[in-house]
């Protein structure tokens, strides 16, 4: 198998169908952890393994420690992780199930748009954006995408913890609800890879 980062490098953008499938399997995997009171804290494409049949396995469970501001500023190593960190994680070192959902939302945004919503040339600026700016609506990057998909991503990536679903089980249920309302065109939507 390969990790999702490898697939992203190969494909650049994904269809709504592929994105929601991978997001769904990731949420499903996280749901068991959240029920057991475990938060992952470091959800990013590098930690999402796709087996030979393309199914998701989440790696690095429990290895990820909350990232302190000091480590963020002192090393560029964390730039990758910084792109997916939830605001409360950055500000208060607070690891929550909703923080995992935020990371999943950023990952989904990136799969659909072919780029992360916030970019910066250093981790400090990047985390500052996550704390002080709202994640742009996915429709800004993917015009014509289904409004329900956009709303679901907006909920996952809400800046305030309480505006996100409570945990991965709740998010998974919301996703299933959303999927039952998608048309064939909605499923097939894919942003043409921009060079």
Describe each model-derived feature in a short phrase.
Residues 71-83, 90:
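Activation loop
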Residues 26-38:
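Protein kinase catalytic-loop region centered on the HRD/HxD motif
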Residues 38-45, 50:
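Catalytic-loop of the protein kinase fold
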Residues 83-186:
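C-terminal lobe helix-coil module of Hanks-type protein kinase domains
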Residues 3-14:
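AlphaC helix of the protein kinase catalytic domain
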Residues 22-23:
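Activation segment signature within eukaryotic-like protein kinase domains
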Residues 183-195:
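Regulatory extensions appended to serine/threonine kinase catalytic cores
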């Amino acid at each position: 198998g390969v990790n999702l980062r490898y697939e992203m490098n190969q494909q650049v953008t994904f269809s709504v169908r592929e994105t929601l499938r991978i997001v769904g399997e990731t949420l499903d995997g996280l749901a068991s952890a959240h029920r057991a009171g475990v938060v992952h804290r470091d959800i990013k494409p590098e930690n999402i393994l796709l087996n030979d049949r393309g199914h998701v396995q989440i790696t690095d469970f429990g290895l990820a420690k909350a990232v302190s501001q000091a480590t963020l500023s002192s090393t560029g190593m964390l730039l990758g992780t910084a792109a997916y960190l939830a605001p409360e994680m950055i500000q208060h070192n607070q690891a929550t199930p909703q923080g995992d959902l935020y990371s999943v939302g950023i990952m989904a945004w990136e799969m659909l748009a072919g780029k992360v919503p916030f970019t910066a040339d250093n981790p400090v600026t990047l985390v500052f954006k996550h704390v002080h700016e709202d994640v742009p609506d996915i429709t800004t990057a993917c015009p014509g995408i289904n409004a329900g998909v956009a709303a679901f991503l907006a909920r996952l990536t809400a800046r305030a913890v309480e505006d996100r679903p409570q945990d991965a089980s709740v998010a998974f249920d919301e996703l299933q609800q959303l999927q039952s309302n998608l048309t064939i065109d909605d499923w097939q939507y894919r942003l043409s890879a921009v060079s």
